[in-house]
Amino acid sequence: MESQQLHQNPHSQHGSAYASVTSKEVPSNQDPLAVSASNLPEFDRDSTKVNSQEETTPGTSAVPENHHHVSPQPASVPPPQNGQYQQHGMMTPNKAMASNWAHYQQPSMMTCSHYQTSPAYYQPDPHYPLPQYIPPLSTSSPDPIDSQDQHSEVPQAKTKVRNNVLPPHTLTSEENFSTWVKFYIRFLKNSNLGDIIPNDQGEIKRQMTYEEHAYIYNTFQAFAPFHLLPTWVKQILEINYSDILTVLCKSVSKMQTNNQELKDWIALANLEYNGSTSADTFEITVSTIIQRLKENNINVSDRLACQLILKGLSGDFKYLRNQYRTKTNMKLSQLFAEIQLIYDENKIMNLNKPSQYKQHSEYKNVSRTSPNTTNTKVTTRNYHRTNSSKPRAAKAHNIATSSKFSRVNSDHINESTVSSQYLSDDNELSLRPATERI
């Protein structure tokens, strides 16, 4: 009889289960399974509703109302300590200053429906149940900075976040992530959060607060859909769902790598060599550029490298262009060997040039001072040298020599006069002297 009654009333099971959670006692003389939900008194149904609401566990108010199923609640788990947050750390609430954008730390302010199905982000809707393995941000966790140095002071933000900052555009594809992250970093800098963004070396100026962490996390997930992120970004977030700083740090590093690739291509295309530096230095410079490009999955063939090098050769190395013009199989090592050979030959010639010049100069000096020289050009120049060009000492010497010569001539004339007079006296001849002394 009872089985037939249950079969006829399919809702009787639900009614009995619904009544079992109430605080209303069922009379012991009546089988509770035999009483259908429709036969309960009106006050019993009201008390059942009230008591079922009172016995609801704390925390289920955030879950959408469901009378037939109660969602499991997430366990209280401290924030993840893996990833880069062991190094960077976050400030405790007593260190964090009162933020003017505190409402941005509420996930409900950044509602985005397509993130509700992604396991790598904690859900932006506070009414959505969180998975057990994704803990939310908690301000009661121990600060790793306090465990190291309790008296250390961390710089805090002193400016307010601007309210009229232009938000970044939404990421549209995985290939555009490198471009999108530039706009996102600019967005954070315009929001006065540039001092917590890692630089090229992965260093930051100060530690971020919990409010700033939530602000960065929520804005990142709002404008970057998870299914459009690159694989390396997904791998980071799967290890630590909130480690946005590591993503930004590696993004900056990749941007620097891309800039370095461009610089290397420009340097390789503008190579110049004229022998002013050693051939070894030139070879090391070119090889370093080619190796750096190879590490970034950019292979430079020997033929292309030889063509770029030959284009920049000048001076004594220029003739190598004609030598390699007809070659089809160019080897970079062979080209470097020939450049080294020319450089060594020029170096030997430059070392011999000063000694040859010195010997030639000494030969010229000897020919000028030798008395037996046959250089008519030197003799003519010295013979016609005027007294006006002589130095003052030479002029005085010439004057003294000329006066001495005149005195010698006058003495000779006097002696001849006396001898002539003596001859005339002996021969008794009267002769007229040739000269008279004045």
From Swiss-Prot:
It comes from the Eukaryota. Residues 295-397 are annotated as: RNA-binding. Residues 1-39, 49-60, 399-408, 415-424 have a biased composition (Polar residues). Its main location: cytoplasm. GO terms for molecular function: RNA binding. It is found in: Cytoplasm. Keywords: Cytoplasm, RNA-binding, Transposable element. Residues 369-381 have a biased composition (Low complexity). The record marks 397-398 as: Cleavage. Residues 1-89, 366-438 are annotated as: Disordered. One of its GO terms (cellular component) is cytoplasm. GO terms for biological process: viral translational frameshifting. The keyword Ribosomal protein does not apply. Pfam families: TYA. The keyword Translocase does not apply. Retrotransposons are mobile genetic entities that are able to replicate via an RNA intermediate and a reverse transcription step. In contrast to retroviruses, retrotransposons are non-infectious, lack an envelope and remain intracellular. Ty2 retrotransposons belong to the copia elements (pseudoviridae). The C-terminal RNA-binding region of CA is sufficient for all its nucleocapsid-like chaperone activities. Capsid protein (CA) is the structural component of the virus-like particle (VLP), forming the shell that encapsulates the retrotransposons dimeric RNA genome. The particles are assembled from trimer-clustered units and there are holes in the capsid shells that allow for the diffusion of macromolecules. CA also has nucleocapsid-like chaperone activity, promoting primer tRNA(i)-Met annealing to the multipartite primer-binding site (PBS), dimerization of Ty2 RNA and initiation of reverse transcription. Homotrimer. This is Transposon Ty2-DR2 Gag polyprotein. It comes from Saccharomyces cerevisiae (strain ATCC 204508 / S288c) (Baker's yeast). The lineage of its organism: Eukaryota, Fungi, Dikarya, Ascomycota, Saccharomycotina.
